[in-house]
Amino acid sequence: MAQPAHVPKFGNWDGENISYTTYFETVHRDKGDGSKIFNPNDPEENPQAFYPRTVAQDHQHSEKHHNDTSTDYHVVKQHRRKHHRREDREFHRYVEAPRPHRSPFQGVDMDSHRSRNHGTSATMSSSVKRNSDNWLPQHQHHRRTNKDLAEGKSWLFTTTTASSYTKSRKLSRECSSTTQSSISAKNLVPGDETRSPISWRVFQSYLTKLKEQKQIAATKIGQHLNLR
């Protein structure tokens, strides 16, 4: 079996010769106090290990970009100067050019044209106003006519409804009187038909008359419903 590693006591570390304690003591021997430890796995401390381009190439690229930008700026500036100079020359040429002479007859023609236009506009406004004045009474008359027609229709509907209601009540009263007569006729039936043949004939004729009255009332109701 392998022997376990010898672990020194806490107080005997300086006296005994232990390999790992010696290694830890000599790690920072070459570095002075306060120096920063270099970490090769940090991209900020070791950018060349993580990016393909070197620092020198980045510096050259930035200088080239600056030179190209300055060159473009000068080209654009020269182009704008040429453009402004051309505009200034055209403006001076326009100011110094002679003005065309206008005869007094042209002014008279313009004044007459303006007066004709003013007269035409005044005539159109007066005609529009006259047409609007004529349209207003016609519109009011049309509104009154529509109102009268509406009132006439409502009166006719009310009258027709009232007459229909009166006829219905009259027919219902006739039917109720006929029913009451039939009820009173039942009270006239004798107890023995063989003992009073005369009264039975009278009762039979009375029943026939009641049937006729019922038929007449039913006919009137049917005619009234058909008329509605």
Swiss-Prot record:
Annotated Basic and acidic residues bias: 56-75
Membrane-spanning ranges: none
Biased composition (Polar residues): 118-133
Region (Disordered): 56-87, 99-133
Ranges of compositional bias, category Basic residues: 76-86
Family indicated by similarity: Belongs to the RIN4 family.
Protein name: NOI-like protein
Phylogenetic placement of the source organism: Eukaryota, Viridiplantae, Streptophyta, Embryophyta, Tracheophyta
